[in-house]
């Protein structure tokens, strides 16, 4: 059965950076999926030690047509051996904006989903809301939730083209 926690950064004593580090510290994940509208190098550096360990099983989707995401951040993710998809909507009037992190194992998964981008401010300083979902993949609805998330992000016909 799912365990759900609410996080309101900068109003409480909980921070997205800490929760993301916890997610990335579970070394038995078979897959890590990240999606952010904006990524800056300082955001990558704040979780780089944990991400490096899981880089070979990590895929990140990063919005690029937004005047915020930096080439240095994308380069750093690539240096860590993370598979990166740069998502360009083709217009400035629509930006790629989903923010979530998924760690998926054989029997469980953790999802961090909310408003925080992968910038230092987004992970540490801004007032950001999020939910931490700890899922049991033996529960059909929870497995379907994870499978749908992974399929939606990795289906070449939807985002990654």
Language-model features and meaning:
Residues 1-161:
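PLD/PLD-like phosphodiesterase catalytic module centered on the HKD motif
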């Amino acid at each position: 059965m799912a365990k759900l926690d609410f996080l309101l950064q900068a109003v409480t004593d909980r921070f997205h950076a800490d929760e993301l580090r916890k997610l990335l510290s579970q070394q038995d994940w078979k897959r890590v999926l990240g999606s952010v509208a904006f990524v800056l190098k300082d955001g990558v550096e704040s979780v780089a030690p944990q991400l490096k360990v899981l880089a070979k099983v990590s895929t990140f989707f990063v919005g690029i047509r937004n005047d915020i995401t930096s080439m240095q951040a994308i380069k750093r993710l690539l240096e860590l051996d993370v598979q990166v998809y740069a998502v360009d909507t083709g217009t400035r009037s629509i930006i790629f904006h989903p923010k979530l992190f998924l760690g998926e194992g054989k029997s469980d998964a953790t999802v961090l989903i909310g408003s925080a981008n992968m910038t230092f401010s987004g992970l540490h300083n801004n007032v950001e809301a999020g939910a931490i979902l700890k899922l049991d993949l033996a529960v059909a609805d929870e497995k379907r939730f994870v499978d749908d998330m992974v399929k939606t992000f990795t289906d070449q016909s939807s985002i990654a083209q």
